[in-house]
Regions:
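Short beta-strand/turn micro-motifs at beta-sheet edges
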Residues: 1-3, 62-67
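A short, polar/proline- and glycine-enriched secondary-structure boundary/capping micro-motif
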Residues: 34, 56, 63-66, 136-139
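Core segments of cupin and vicinal oxygen chelate
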Residues: 16-58
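Short, charged/polar, Gly/Pro-enriched secondary-structure boundary elements
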Residues: 50-54, 60-62, 121-125
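Alpha-helical elements of the RecA-like P-loop NTPase motor core of helicases
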Residues: 24-25, 88, 125
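N-terminal beta-strand motif that seeds the catalytic metal site of vicinal oxygen chelate
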Residues: 1-21, 74-79, 131-140
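Vicinal oxygen chelate
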Residues: 2-6, 9-18, 65-140
């Protein structure tokens, strides 16, 4: 039996980080995502229409633990990019800010360009060409 889940997309993405202050600088200043709520152990940032919930690691987290895309679970998160100009500007800005990233790449399966980068905990992100999604958001 099919559940036939109907959704407009991801509401929020929750990430655990080892250093909340460092993550606040990365997401709030480096990526310039608006911080909309802060608590002692977390903050919420807006990535377009998606809420990022950034939380401290749990006390039982193994010391030195880092994100690993090869484990079962999240491989990476991709943010939609609406124009080639913005993609190129972002790739250059990541490089200038010394954020670990790839150069602009081409996905041969979906035939789209993107740039991949990591946050200070090694959490993998992509900024991925999807102009049709940007147009849909602009029409909301």
């Amino acid at each position: 039996m099919s559940i036939a889940l109907q959704t407009a997309g991801i509401h929020h993405l929750a990430l655990r980080v080892t250093d909340l202050a460092r993550a606040h600088v990365f997401y709030g200043r480096t990526l310039d995502f608006p911080i909309v709520l802060e608590t002692r152990d977390s903050f919420l940032a807006l990535a377009g229409h998606t809420v990022l919930v950034i939380r401290r690691v749990q006390p039982e987290t193994t010391a030195g633990d880092r994100f690993d895309a090869s484990r079962v679970g999240l491989d990476h998160a991709a943010l939609a990019c609406g124009s080639e100009t913005e993609l190129e500007r972002t790739a250059a800005a990541l490089d200038a800010a010394k954020v670990p990233s790839t150069s602009l790449r081409f996905d041969p399966v979906l035939k789209r360009r993107y740039v991949a980068f990591t946050d200070p905990d090694g959490i993998a992100w992509e900024f991925y060409m999807a102009p049709e999604l940007e147009l849909a958001v602009a029409d909301d």
